[in-house]
């Protein structure tokens, strides 16, 4: 691997790590997708697939947008109990494979001790850890009558040097795009009204360089 290629790889890895490294305040459990739904997407910029907070507030995300709602105390406690049960499974650790399939998810458990688990395979085709597969399926498909569209107050800028097919757009935010190369910076939602958000990236021209930029929605109290 040449020095230029190695540097680019480390740059992208650092940005991805920073994008998924922050904690959501008061979270009980968070599920994030680590695989792109479509070619060219930036999976680390997609909103979390599922978030449950200690007060029963819940967020459900897709490729770019989120819905927010609130669970009854009994509903939240049921999910918490299932999480406790999963923690006690034999073979449960930092990385598990459920079975076949290219899917990769990050399960972030926060209540009762922080623990991040990379889960590989399609939970619908699980051959091991059925309780974990069942929980993951429930959270990935989660629906609730209280859910309403969530409008974030800010976004995290995830950027890397590169090009996309077609033209590029002018950078319109106050802080230079290069400031987000090693660690995402936040921008107000009001300034991002005409930008694609979530996993769908934009091509940006700034000076003599071009960047691939994605805006990840931030939850209340979350920092990039």
Q: How should each PLM-predicted stretch be described?
A:
Residues 59-91:
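A short-motif feature that recognizes glycine-rich, charge-decorated loops
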Residues 54-55, 73-76, 109-115:
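A short, structured loop/turn motif at beta-sheet edges
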Residues 42-63, 178-183, 187:
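Short, flexible N-terminal segments of the mature chain
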Residues 10-20:
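Hydrophobic h-region of N-terminal signal peptides that target proteins for export
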Residues 48-50, 67-69, 113-119:
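Short beta-strand segments
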Residues 1-7:
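Bacterial N-terminal signal peptides that target proteins for export
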Residues 45, 73-76, 126:
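Amphipathic, non-membrane alpha-helical segments in soluble helical-bundle scaffolds
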Residues 19-38, 42, 91-224:
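Short, well-ordered, aromatic-rich surface patches in folded extracellular/luminal domains
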